[in-house]
Amino acid sequence: MTTIVGVRAREVLDSRGFPTVEAEVELEGGARGRAMVPSGASTGTHEALELRDGGKRYLGKGVRRAVENVNERIAPELVGMDALDQEGVDRAMLELDGTPNKANLGANAVLAVSLAVARAAAEALGLPLYRYLGGVQGVTLPVPLMNVINGGKHADNRVDFQEFMLVPAGAGSFAEALRIGAEVFHTLKAVLKEKGYSTNVGDEGGFAPDLRSNEEAVELLLLAIERAGYTPGQEVSLALDPATSELYRDGKYHLEGEGKVLSSEEMVAFWEAWVEKYPIRSIEDGLAEDDWEGWRLLTERLGGKVQLVGDDLFVTNPERLRAGIERGVANAILVKVNQIGTLSETLEAIRLAQRSGYRAVISHRSGETEDSFIADLAVAVNAGQIKTGSLSRSDRLAKYNQLLRIEEELGRAARFLGYAAF
C-alpha cells in the first residue's frame, strides 16, 4: 500500500514570481503527496545547489532542467520503493546525483521529491504530517520569530541588517503569541505612517521603510511594542538576522548605511553593546560564514547571554555543524530544508544539534510558497522556534495558520515553551 508507483514534477511560481519545483508522489494504495520548494535571496556559499536553467526564459530562473531530472531520472529510480523508508529513498537520490552539493540533479529537484514522499507516506497511514514525522512526542508549538522590518537583501533601503524580528515569547500559547505579534505588527504600521515612512513590505512581509540607521529600526520596534500595550523584554523581545556574510569583504564588515567598516573584534563589541542596550534574545549570523575565529570570540563573549544562531555558518549541513560544535561556536542552528536538500539530512542535522545542546530554529526562505511543510516539521522535532516571516503575505500566513490548526488538534497535549525555548 505504501509502494511508490508514480513520481512527477512541474514548474510552479514562488512568492517572488520566479519558478520553483513542485513534485507529486503517488503510492500503490492511492495516497498522494505534494511538495513545493522555497528559494533564498541571501544564500550561503556552502548550500546545496539550486538548479536553474539560465538563458532568457524567466530571466534565467526557469527550473525545467530540475523538473526533467525528476520526471526522467529520479522517478524511474524510486518507483517500486517503499515510501515509509524515507532514508532509503533519500539515499537513492543522493547516490543517483553523486555530488556533494546535489549539483547534478539539483537540490530543488531532490528536495521536492523527498518532502512529497513524506507527505504521501503520512497520507497512506492516515496521520497528520507532524505526527508521522515526530510520533507521539512531537507536541511543541514553536515561538514565532516574526520578521517585521526588512533590510539588506530583502529590501531596497539603507538598512544594512536583513531582519528585525518580534519574539512574543511571553505568551502562554502559540495562538496568543500570534495575536500579540499581529497587534504589534499593525501598531508598527501606524507608527511608520505617523513618522512619514513607507509601509510597503519586503519579501517576507515585513515593512521596508527607508530608515536612517539600523538602530532606528530597533527603536521603532520598541516603540510599537509599547504602543501596543506590551513591555519590551517581557511579553515581547527582539531577534536579529543581520546576515553579515553579505556585509563581509576583505576581512572586514562594511556597514554602508552607517558609513562604518569594522573588524571581527569590533563587530563582536558592536553586538555586545546592543545586547546590553536592547532586549535581544537571538542573533543569527552575527558574523560571516567563514569567520570562524570571529564566531569563537562572539560565542565566548555572548554565548551565555543570548541565542547565537548559525545560518550561513552551518547551512543545515551536519558536517558543518559538527565542525562548529568541535570549535565551540554558536549555540543554535537555523534549519532550512533547501540548504541541504533532503528530509533525512535535515532531520540528521536537527538531531545532532539537539544532542549537542544546540537549539534548532526551523526557517522559511525569502522566496516561499503556500506549502506549510515546515510548520509540521517544527512541531514534529520539538524545535521550539520558527522563522516564517511577518504578519502579511499569504505564503507566510500559510505556516502560521497550519500551526494554529495543529495546536487546536493537539489540545491539552500541546506545549508552548515561551522563553524556555531559548
Swiss-Prot record:
(2R)-2-phosphoglycerate binds at Q162, K336, R365, S366, K387. It catalyses: (2R)-2-phosphoglycerate = phosphoenolpyruvate + H2O. Pathway: Carbohydrate degradation; glycolysis; pyruvate from D-glyceraldehyde 3-phosphate: step 4/5. GO terms for molecular function: magnesium ion binding; phosphopyruvate hydratase activity. It holds the Pfam family Enolase_N. It comes from the Bacteria. CDD domains: enolase. Belongs to the enolase family. NCBIfam families: eno. This is Enolase. It comes from Thermus thermophilus (strain ATCC 27634 / DSM 579 / HB8). The gene is eno.
